[in-house]
Design a protein with these regions (language model features):
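Short, Lys/Arg-rich, polar N-terminal cytosolic tail immediately upstream
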Residues: 1-7
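Amphipathic alpha-helical segments and their boundaries
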Residues: 10-66, 79, 107-123, 181-186, ...
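Cytosolic-side ends of inner-membrane transmembrane helices, especially those
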Residues: 16, 192-213
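Residue-level signal for alpha-helical transmembrane segments in multi-pass membrane proteins
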Residues: 26-34, 71, 203-210
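Juxtamembrane amphipathic/coiled-coil helical coupling segments that flank
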Residues: 34-49, 67-74, 129-194
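Heptad-repeat alpha-helical coiled-coil/4-helix-bundle sensor or tether segments in soluble regions
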Residues: 62, 66, 86-145, 160-163, ...
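Short secondary-structure transition hinges
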Residues: 77-85
C-alpha cells in the first residue's frame, strides 16, 4: 500500500478522510459502550440500593407514626381526638404495609431476604397485639380496659416495636453499605472504561500515522 505522501492529492485526501473517519468512529463507539455500561450499572444501583433505602426509610417513619398513634389512642382522654387518631392509625398502617411490600422486590442477597422474612413474621404478631390494645383502649368510658391496654402497650408492644425497628435499621444499614460499595466499584469501573477508551484512541491514532507514512 502506498504511503500518503506518495499518492496523488485526490487519493491522499480520500485516504486521509477515511482514516480520520475510522478513528472518529472507533472513538464514538467506545464512548457509547462506556456510557451504556455505566448507565446500566447506575440504574441497577438505584433500583436495588438507592430507591430501597428511601422505601425502607419511609416505611420506618410510618411504622413509628403508627406506634405513636397507638400510644395516643390509649393515652388521650378526649374521645373525639381518639376517633381522629383511629383514622390516622389506619392510614399510617396501610401506608407502612404498602411501602414495606415494595422493599421485597429489591432484595438481592439471602441475608437481606432472611432479615425481611424475620421482620414479616414478627409483624404478624405485632399487628395482632396492636389491634387488641387499640380495641381495649379506644373508649374513654371503659377505664378498666384502658388501663389494661396501657399496660400491654408499655410492657408487651413497646419491646416488640423496638425489636422490629432494630431489624429494620439492620436492613437499612445493609442496603446503605452495599450501595456505598457498589458506588465505589462504579467509580473505579468508570475510570477503567475511560482509560480504555483513551487507549483505543491512541491505538487508532498510531495506526492512522503508520498508514500515513
Amino acid at each position: 500500500m502506498k504511503k500518503l505522501n506518495e499518492m496523488r492529492i485526490e487519493k491522499r485526501l480520500t485516504t486521509g478522510f477515511r482514516i480520520t473517519t475510522m478513528i472518529t468512529s472507533i472513538a464514538a463507539i467506545a464512548a457509547v459502550i462506556v456510557l451504556l455500561i455505566i448507565s446500566s450499572r447506575y440504574t441497577y444501583a438505584l433500583r436495588y440500593y438507592g430507591f430501597p433505602q428511601g422505601d425502607i426509610g419511609r416505611a420506618m417513619i410510618l411504622f413509628t407514626d403508627s406506634r405513636s398513634d397507638t400510644r395516643a389512642i390509649v393515652g388521650y382522654d378526649n374521645q373525639d381526638e381518639i376517633d381522629d387518631l383511629l383514622s390516622q392509625y389506619d392510614d399510617d398502617r396501610e401506608g407502612f404495609i404498602s411501602r414495606w411490600e415494595a422493599v421485597e422486590d429489591t432484595l438481592v442477597t439471602d441475608a437481606t431476604k432472611s432479615t425481611y422474612q424475620t421482620i414479616n413474621d414478627k409483624l404478624t404478631e405485632y399487628w395482632k397485639l396492636n389491634e387488641e390494645i387499640i380495641e381495649s383502649g379506644k373508649n374513654v368510658s371503659d377505664e378498666s380496659s384502658r388501663q389494661q391496654a396501657q399496660y400491654k402497650a408499655m410492657n408487651e408492644l413497646a419491646p416488640a416495636y423496638e425489636e422490629i425497628n432494630g431489624l429494620m435499621y439492620d436492613l437499612l444499614n445493609t442496603k446503605t453499605n452495599r450501595g456505598d460499595s457498589l458506588d465505589t466499584a462504579l467509580n473505579i469501573a468508570t475510570y477503567v472504561l475511560v482509560a480504555a477508551a483513551i487507549l483505543i484512541l491512541i491505538i487508532s491514532f498510531s495506526i492512522s500515522v503508520r498508514f500515513g507514512r
